[in-house]
Curated annotation (Swiss-Prot):
CDD domains: ATP-synt_F1_alpha_C, ATP-synt_F1_alpha_N, F1-ATPase_alpha_CD. It is found in: Cell membrane. The keyword Ion transport applies. GO terms for molecular function: ADP binding; ATP binding; proton-transporting ATP synthase activity, rotational mechanism. Keywords: ATP synthesis, ATP-binding, Cell membrane, CF(1), Hydrogen ion transport, Ion transport, Membrane, Nucleotide-binding, Translocase, Transport. Produces ATP from ADP in the presence of a proton gradient across the membrane. The alpha chain is a regulatory subunit. HAMAP family: ATP_synth_alpha_bact. It comes from Mycolicibacterium paratuberculosis (strain ATCC BAA-968 / K-10). ATP binds at residues 172-179. The keyword Amino-acid biosynthesis does not apply. The gene is atpA. This is ATP synthase subunit alpha.
Amino acid sequence: MAELTISADDIQSAIEEYVGSFTSDTSREEVGTVVDAGDGIAHVEGLPSVMTQELLEFPGGVLGVALNLDEHSVGAVILGDFEKIEEGQQVKRTGEVLSVPVGDAFLGRVVNPLGQPIDGQGDIETDIRRALEIQAPSVVQRQSVKEPLQTGIKAIDAMTPIGRGQRQLIIGDRKTGKTAVCVDTILNQRQNWESGDEKKQVRCVYVAIGQKGTTIASVRRALEEGGAMDYTTIVAAPASDSAGFKWLAPYTGSAIAQHWMYDGKHVLIVFDDLSKQAEAYRAISLLLRRPPGREAYPGDVFYLHSRLLERCAKLSDELGGGSMTGLPIIETKANDISAYIPTNVISITDGQCFLESDLFNQGVRPAINVGVSVSRVGGAAQIKAMKEVAGSLRLDLSQFRELEAFAAFASDLDATSKAQLDRGARLVELLKQPQYQPMPVEEQVVSIFLGTGGHLDSVPVEDVRRFETELLDHMRASEDKILAGIRDTQKLSDEAAEELEKVINNFKKGFAATGGASVVPDEHVEALDEEELEKESVKVKKPAPEKKAKKEQK
């Protein structure tokens, strides 16, 4: 039997090797316990060092956000499936505040409020992350809004223009075309995107909050068919999602957009709609036992929207000159814009487009109420050509609405009032526009020129849109240099205006109204001058009846 020999050197080297490769698996974690959970909210005890807005990890990898920091417990909003969270489960701190991945890889994708793809097209590969709660640009970091963001909608670009970096509220009752206005605006950016010029290109973010899944799918389909998904990201928090997701979705969209803005690019973000975000935040606050205020909303509901919308800005040239334009949507009830949330958002934004259900039902689409709608940026966000032709449009339409109400009760109207009514009816018809058919700005200028210049006064109201469509088709085919001149110079010179009038007058000669009648106005006969009037007049002296009777008696 072989003798067992033990070498002290071998034992020593083995121990040294083991000690050198030893790593401690112990770690220090702050762990809390779920006290109660339900309706997407959990109260946790035992996390004394937790930060506000810090991410917490629940069993199964479910995340939560610490909102209420009470003396003995933490109130957290659960992001995801909260049905499996029970009393007594352990909760860990992550030491991180909520952030989302950002970057160009998000273009063309549909994501949830955590930045995770939900469109079935694979993972989104990006190394850049951005915190959701981030300070808005300061006054020094901004510059005034001066570049137009064309929506492609005549009524908006002519009367309530939107500039890059502006916040323009779209407000109205349900089913009045609010989403359609925003989708049209996204579709209208396609030409700029295809130009390849980064100064013209506008990336778009559409945030769907509390919408039906079918509605979000139809918006995505419309964007795909219009070739707009190449430069658009959709952040979806449908009605089936928890209140926490609906509350966070706008901040996620804003973080994705801000990344591009600080990179010197231009972004358009649509919040559809902030009424549902406010309702979700109200539900969260009431469940967390926060004191309710007006309409049961918490006291900081104004701050909820102001800190979101203040991120929209036109950055200074030192920071790259990027911009983020916001189109928040608010749903009213019975056209009441004096309710709590509508007045809050009106006071935060730089103007509003009010869509009225009565106008919508009358067939005026987009159903923009000119009297209540306003843009506080105004002419600074318009090209010179549009500013020239649309200067009197708002006043003409406002006077028409007043006269229309008066004419309903009065039978006798003077010629001036009748002329105003006739022109106003044609302007209303001219501003109607089909859904998902945005119009280039140079064609809008020609269209508005037709109305404000009185060139449609001889065209029957029912033929106004056909006249406009056929004239623009004719100009694209044979008079494209006028359109190209407006597009390139962004001005309508006197020579171009005269040439445009000639084209319109020549086109009128070949245009026939529905009944076959000509739309060329009758030749205007000028009144005689005073000198000619004296030459033509014949003076006849007749004696007075009394004197004539006395002569007969004599």
